[in-house]
Amino acid sequence: MDNSTEETFSMDTSEPLEEGEQTHEQRPHTRSNPEGAEDRGVVHQAGVGSRSEGEGEAAQVEDPLPTTTTVPTNSTPPPTLEFQLKTPRVNCPEKVIICLDLSEEMSTQKLESFNGSKANALNSSQKMIEMFVRTKHKIDKRHEFALVVANNEAMWLSGFTSDPREVCSCLYDLETNVCESFNLEGLFNLIQQRTEFPVTDNVQTIPPPYVVRIILIYSRPASQPALALTDNMKKMLQCPYFFFDVIYIHNGSEEEELCWKDIFGFFSSLDSKGTSYKYEVSITGPALELHNCMARLLAHPLQRPFQSHAAYSLLEEEEESPESEVTV
């Protein structure tokens, strides 16, 4: 992948600099700062990066390593050719809509925290969302973020902003509720009302001014009413500049294994283009797995490969283990 446009994957939790605190000292050209990318001023028009034919295409990766999620059910095969759209692999701005589930399951104290104590999924999700937003902002200050919370219905909590502090100010004063269902169609309708989708004359050659991405953090019991896909949702999902990433936090119990796998399979089936990422994490497992999933979502959706082709070890022959995964 072209290092001049590739986004980095390291989480950062530091506060963004205030106006007046910015320095003009040029950093050396390193892997984390290729060609002094972070030292260039912010421009209003997305940079157009030309790439040779087929460069960085996921379909040309040989012998890919498996993904490092809890079970291999999220390694979905690449989609059929009719949906394999080739879009410019550029680092254009993102409009990221983070949807946080507020069902009562998120308050269950079952996750194993870093110090060995028990934590709930809501607190862990709040921390990883803040780290994600701050890190994406450092990668490209043109990125914008919005926060949506989901009870029985989705509610727009924070409008699009490029200031991480505005998002984080709304993030922690949240409480879980008993929820009877999850209105996925309502979530898509809300996003369609609040977001304008980009359009270009040529999808394959002209970079979009921005892309739209939903990151859904979902934790509902498998006993709730089945999720459904409508025609309007299909149209949104087939847009080449729209991405729907999912982190599914399930109870991990063996007796309900088939049920939560069905839900995870439904989310996987929504990705007709093969460009979205889906992860499942057990609510009884380590919180590190949850943070690892969010760290992998730092990659720009136009630049990342199919999820089944993604590898996170430094060497091809190196076997991945929980200790070697991305930590935050």
UniProtKB/Swiss-Prot annotation:
Organism phylogeny: Eukaryota, Metazoa, Chordata, Craniata, Vertebrata
Example of a GO cellular component annotation carried by this entry: nucleus
Biased composition (Low complexity): 64-74
Protein's cellular compartments: Cytoplasm; Nucleus
The protein's name: BRISC and BRCA1-A complex member 1
Domain remarks in the Swiss-Prot or TrEMBL record: The VWFA-like region is similar to the VWFA domain. Its presence reveals similarities between the structure of the 19S proteasome and the BRCA1-A complexes.
Subunit structure, as described in the record: Component of the ARISC complex, at least composed of uimc1/rap80, abraxas1, brcc3/brcc36, BABAM2 and babam1/nba1. Component of the BRCA1-A complex, at least composed of brca1, bard1, uimc1/rap80, abraxas1, brcc3/brcc36, BABAM2 and babam1/nba1. In the BRCA1-A complex, interacts directly with abraxas1 and BABAM2. Component of the BRISC complex, at least composed of abraxas2, brcc3/brcc36, babam2 and babam1/nba1.
Region (VWFA-like) residue spans: 96-297
UniProt-listed InterPro entries: BABAM1 (IPR026126), vWFA_dom_sf (IPR036465)
Annotated segments matching region Disordered: 1-84
Keywords: Cell cycle, Cell division, Chromatin regulator, Cytoplasm, DNA damage, DNA repair, Mitosis, Nucleus, Ubl conjugation pathway
Main location: cytoplasm
Superkingdom, natural source: Eukaryota
Family that this chain belongs to: Belongs to the BABAM1 family.
Record's compositionally biased regions (Polar residues): 1-13
One annotated GO biological process: response to ionizing radiation
Chain's role: Component of the BRCA1-A complex, a complex that specifically recognizes 'Lys-63'-linked ubiquitinated histones H2A and H2AX at DNA lesions sites, leading to target the BRCA1-BARD1 heterodimer to sites of DNA damage at double-strand breaks (DSBs). The BRCA1-A complex also possesses deubiquitinase activity that specifically removes 'Lys-63'-linked ubiquitin on histones H2A and H2AX. In the BRCA1-A complex, it is required for the complex integrity and its localization at DSBs.
Signal peptide: none
Annotated organism of origin: Xenopus laevis (African clawed frog)
